[in-house]
Amino acid sequence: MEEPPQEALAEPLKHESPAAPSSAGHTKGQEEDDQKNQAERKADNHTAHRIADQTALRVPSQAESSIFSQATNGVAEQNGHSTPGQAGRRASNPADVSDLRADDQVNQTPSEQTKGKASSQANNVQHEQSDGQVSGLTEERTAEQTERRLPTQAERRTSGQIDGRLAMPSDQRGSRQTDHRMAGQSERRASEQMDRRMSGEAERRTSEQITHRLSKLSERRPSVQIDSGSSVPSDQSPSVQIDSGSSVPSDQRPSVQIDRRMSGKVRRRSSEKTDYRLAGLADPGTSEQTDLRLYGLVDHKTSVKTHHQVYGQATELAEHQAIDQAHSNADQPPVDNAHYTESDQTDHLADRQANHKDQLSYYETRGQSEDRIFPQLGNSKEDKEADYRVQPCKFEDSQVDLNSKPSVEMETQNATTIPPYNPVDARFTSNFQAKDQALFPRLPSISSKLNYTSSQEKTQAIVTKSDEFSEIDQGKGYHIRNQTYRRFPSIVYEDPYQVSLQYMEKHHILQIFQQITENLVYEKPEDPLNFMLCQV
């Protein structure tokens, strides 16, 4: 509000100076009203201070700065006539703003009272103006307070809601995580305990089954070994005993290995599958695997036993092999000796010949004993004829010595006893060529010369004669005697292809058919069969 001009106030005071005592009573009442208004203002200021303090404590620093800046701006706009120092004070503290306003109004009222004692109208106007200012200020303060309270309450509610919402998800997440962790740990512990129990039960079952089956197999094996013990020769009996003696630890070792393998497999299955499936599948799977392995071991041992039985039946061959090995070891020259001379070589050859003669004498005496035994048993003519038949002879490496002198003599005697074979070509070639030229001059000559190198060997009658071996015993003084082995009759082997070829060449069958076919093709008769018969 604008202040009234002092000159205008001075003029009515001059004119109304005699009426000043009459307005003294009016001033007293006005002062009382002013005091009441000041008391009300002070009460309003106190309430404003309290509300400001509460809002300063509750609202954040940013909200305080914005609110104080708005308050200072509003006060500066309303009190445009205030001094710069007062504006600075108001901006610094909102509580001081209200005090300054009240002081200004109080200072203005006495001056207005002293100046306007003469004119009641001017005083009434001033009081109305001051009342309007005070009422406007109070209304602005209440509006600002309500505006401040509303945003602060809204901020409190929103912040409380946000804090509650944020706190609730964080609490819920933490509780859920802890619940999940506790549940996972409890489930892991329970599953581990169940897996351990199931694996222990499966291992116990498999071990019991394996021990039971091994006990059955161990009961079966001694009986089989006792049965096969009689047929095994004396040379092989120690090996069989060693096998039977080592069967017990060998059975225990596979059982331990099977237990370890099966326990590992059962543990893997228990970790992958449920407990109920493991209880149902562990027994059949382990039993099948143990059955296959145990049966494989049993089959291997039975095959070895049958192998021993087969070799047990051939005791004589084993004895002969042992004798031959001994002789061959004796026959081997001492190569390792550095001073091996020619005299040693001659001695070695003489020893070999003596050993060979000893072997021949052994087989001769054995053949004579067989010849003596068979007539006593009553051999028939069929048996004798069967004896004269050619039978395959099997000589061992130790019995045949190509470097020995008797073998060389045998070969020379056989070569001399075999007569030379004269082929039949010489008989047919001359006659056949003359007849061909006389009978069939137009036909080309067919060569009848064949290679009979292979047929000579096949058609040759092999006559085996036993060589006469002299037996000389230097140490024991055996008599020298000549004895022949069995004489086999001559066997003539004829090839059917060679026989048919000789027949066709003998009767000129090829030339006849060649002439007939030539005439048939040349004349081309309607009845070729009759034509061919007429030709013959």
From Swiss-Prot:
InterPro entries: Tex55, TEX55_DD. Residues 62-85, 105-136, 243-255 have a biased composition (Polar residues). Testis-specific. The keyword Plastid does not apply. Residues 1-287, 328-348 are annotated as: Disordered. It is found in: Nucleus; Cell projection, Cilium, Flagellum. Residues 35-52, 138-158, 173-222, 339-348 have a biased composition (Basic and acidic residues). Residues 1-11, 226-242 have a biased composition (Low complexity). It comes from the Eukaryota. Keywords: Cell projection, Cilium, Flagellum, Nucleus. The keyword Nucleus applies. GO terms for cellular component: nucleus; sperm flagellum. Pfam families: Tex55. PANTHER family: TESTIS-SPECIFIC EXPRESSED PROTEIN 55. This is Testis-specific expressed protein 55. The lineage of its organism: Eukaryota, Metazoa, Chordata, Craniata, Vertebrata. The gene is TEX55.
